């Protein structure tokens, strides 16, 4: 499959990044403040907010934790209607 994501996944990454950005702004936090809490570079936080797919998931989790949104990760595949139907 290579490093290029299907367009649909790229769009979803951008939506996730935008949601993280909005959560940061609602909390009146700067990119630098999040980067300091997460112990990563401000550039990495910026990449997350832009939906760049090369950022490791552990960094996403640390950003969610810094925003007190880490429990939201538990919502992934929670219902899994298709899997339950199999």
Q: Language-model segments: which ranges?
A:
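Short, basic-rich loop-to-helix N-cap that marks the start of a DNA-contacting helix
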Residues: 52-65
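Short, charged recognition helix plus adjacent turn
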Residues: 74-86
């Amino acid at each position: 499959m290579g490093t290029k994501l299907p367009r649909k996944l790229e769009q979803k990454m951008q939506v996730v990044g935008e949601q993280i950005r909005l959560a940061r702004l609602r909390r009146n936090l700067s990119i630098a403040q999040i980067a300091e809490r997460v112990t990563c570079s401000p550039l990495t936080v910026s990449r997350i907010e832009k939906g760049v797919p090369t950022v490791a998931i552990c960094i996403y989790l640390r950003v969610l934790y810094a925003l007190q949104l880490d429990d939201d990760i538990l919502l992934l595949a929670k219902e899994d209607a298709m899997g339950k139907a199999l």
